[in-house]
Amino acid sequence: MINEVEEKKYGLKYYAFDWDDNLMKMPTQIILMSEDGDEVGMSTEDFAEYRTEIGNTPFEYEGKTIVGFGKDPFKYFRTAGDSKFMKDIETAPLVRGPWSDFVEAINNGSVFSIITARGHNPNTLKKGVLKLILMGRGGLDKEKLVESLIKYREIMGLKPVTDENWLIRDYLDRCKFYPVSFGEGSATNPEE
């Protein structure tokens, strides 16, 4: 979790989360090039450690000498990797602390944002969260979410809605999905 702000009047919380190595340990790999011309996959966790060396200083990784990036090193982190992302979220290991905050945010119907270096279409990230809710992954509870959304509408004096699908879609539309490498951004140094 990056930030949490509490609104005292109604006890509402707003959350911001990073995806990789914060909510989930995704198996998606960055593609590197060995001195033999072989492509070698590197985890995002390892990439955080080695990224300043890639292309600057050859180093040993997974039994290979890495000399730079592969031809399309972040292909699985962009729109070309959308279907892989949707499949990987079904089984990727959850990161205990931040994941429990994510579950709390969703089950309570709190607005959240996903800020990630990934370059997927924002709608892919939104569909991914919907899939996780419908799966009941890691404590996410569709019924608790719907109950919270109905209660929110009541507290805010909004027209009652009982269509669960509409409530969840409306909720996810209020949440924000910021893949900073979507379009023209670079996943190599997304903070730039």
Question: Where are the model-predicted features located?
Answer:
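Active-site-proximal specificity loops/subdomain of glycosyltransferases
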Residues: 184-188
